[in-house]
Swiss-Prot record:
It is found in: Nucleus. It holds the Pfam family Pou. This is Homeotic protein NRL-19. One of its GO terms (biological process) is regulation of transcription by RNA polymerase II. Its main location: nucleus. GO terms for cellular component: nucleus. It comes from Xenopus laevis. PROSITE patterns: POU_2 (PS00465), POU_3 (PS51179).
Length: 105
C-alpha cells in the first residue's frame, strides 16, 4: 500500500499515504475522495500491468520503493560517555548538550 501511494506520487505528483490506500480498499473514504482517487488508481494499474510484461521495467518498479534511513550506530566509547553524562545530569540544557557534542567529536 505504501509503494502504491509512492508510485502514484512519482507518476502523477500526488503522494498518497499507506493509510489512504488502505481506506480506499476498505471503502472507508468519502464518496468525493473515492471519486478523485479511482481514476488515478485505474490509470496507475493499467500502466503497471502493461509495463510488468517487460523484465527491464520490473527493475524500475522495484527501484521506486521507499529509501530507508541508515541505522544510527554509536561508537562504544562515545556511548559510554553519553550514558555517564546523562546519569549525572538527566535533563541537560541545550548549551550542555552542545558542549557535550563538541567534546565528543
Amino acid at each position: 500500500q505504501a509503494d502504491v501511494g509512492l508510485a502514484l506520487g512519482t507518476l502523477y505528483g500526488n503522494v498518497f499515504s499507506q493509510t489512504t490506500i488502505c481506506r480506499f480498499e476498505a471503502l472507508q473514504l468519502s464518496f468525493k475522495y473515492m471519486c478523485k482517487l479511482k481514476p488515478l488508481l485505474n490509470k496507475w494499474l493499467e500502466e503497471t500491468d502493461s509495463t510488468t510484461e517487460s523484465p527491464i521495467n520490473l527493475d524500475k518498479i522495484a527501484a521506486q520503493g521507499r529509501k530507508r534511513k541508515k541505522r544510527t550506530s554509536i561508537e562504544v566509547g562515545v556511548k559510554g560517555a553519553l550514558e555517564n553524562h546523562f546519569l549525572k545530569c538527566p535533563k541537560p540544557s541545550a548549551h550542555e548538550i552542545t558542549s557535550l557534542a563538541d567534546s565528543l567529536q
